[in-house]
């Protein structure tokens, strides 16, 4: 679609979303648009420091977990000694960016609002690691904590997965992987999905929305996909195009959150409609006036805080 035909998104977003967009960090260098992925990762980490400040304090522990690919870093957030469940969090970043620091505040708030242990998994990024390595390492970490739950003093009898953007895809893909391969890591009580992509290659929102403000132009989305997948055939894998998986049975209860001006919104709508049509437990909530990635901005946006509280409430209601 010609750029001129797209919606004037920055004129339509909410006042609090505009405040975020217009917030300048004077000590931040320019985005390295033509830089290496390493430079973009470094910038992303620096840019997120401001948005992660002021998060709740709680007991936090870091562990390296063995997988067949090597060790993966994990971080445990423990809001109380007797947690009713454990939530595994998978960060967004287009499969190529992000780490446990860039999503620290999100994980802390989720732990605080749910009063559950949250475990962030620093899964391997692309293009160094190609599909399905990230999913396999996530599953390995989940299995490790299930086997060692007593040693780590965590409750793995009931678990959940949560993630934003690319992390939302990894969240649902990991839950389906466990189901399909009959791997027991505890009962999956719920899955929390904020503005994910689930397999659509084109849609109305992908045509009308997306630009330099969110890093989700058609070219951006293609770049993320090419970095993540090993080959063209992977596009149809049921763990990448999740609509090619069986969504008619034994899908854990899903909280599906959409951002109004997100080009990936139709992925969330289709996922909800598919699950609902087959009587799979799910809830969809649209957050008006928001852009993709708004969950990061709870320092300024009540809507971001609300979205985290909604996800936490959904999860605890399943326990």
Curated annotation (Swiss-Prot):
InterPro entries in the record: AB_hydrolase_3 (IPR013094), AB_hydrolase_fold (IPR029058), Acetyl_esterase (IPR023508), GDXG_lipolytic_enzyme (IPR050300), Lipase_GDXG_HIS_AS (IPR002168), Lipase_GDXG_put_SER_AS (IPR033140)
UniProt keyword terms in alphabetical order: Cytoplasm, Hydrolase, Serine esterase
Entry annotated with the keyword Protein biosynthesis: no
Entry GO MF terms: carboxylic ester hydrolase activity
Entry GO terms, CC: cytoplasm
Pfam families with a match to the protein in the record: Abhydrolase_3 (PF07859)
Enzyme Commission code(s) on record: 3.1.1.-
Top-level EC class as recorded in UniProt: hydrolase
UniProt keyword Ribonucleoprotein, yes or no: no
Catalytic-site annotation from UniProt: 165, 262, 292
Motif Involved in the stabilization of the negatively charged intermediate by the formation of the oxyanion hole, chain ranges: 91-93
Subcellular location: Cytoplasm
Function: Displays esterase activity towards short chain fatty esters (acyl chain length of up to 8 carbons). Able to hydrolyze triacetylglycerol (triacetin) and tributyrylglycerol (tributyrin), but not trioleylglycerol (triolein) or cholesterol oleate. Negatively regulates MalT activity by antagonizing maltotriose binding. Inhibits MelA galactosidase activity.
Subunit structure: Homodimer. Interacts with MalT and MelA.
Entry-linked PANTHER family: AB HYDROLASE SUPERFAMILY PROTEIN C4A8.06C (PTHR48081), ALPHA_BETA HYDROLASE FOLD-3 DOMAIN-CONTAINING PROTEIN-RELATED (PTHR48081:SF8)
NCBIfam families reported for this sequence: PRK10162.1
The family this protein is said to belong to: Belongs to the 'GDXG' lipolytic enzyme family.
Name under which the protein is recorded: Acetyl esterase
Species per Swiss-Prot/TrEMBL record: Escherichia coli O139:H28 (strain E24377A / ETEC)
Originating gene: aes
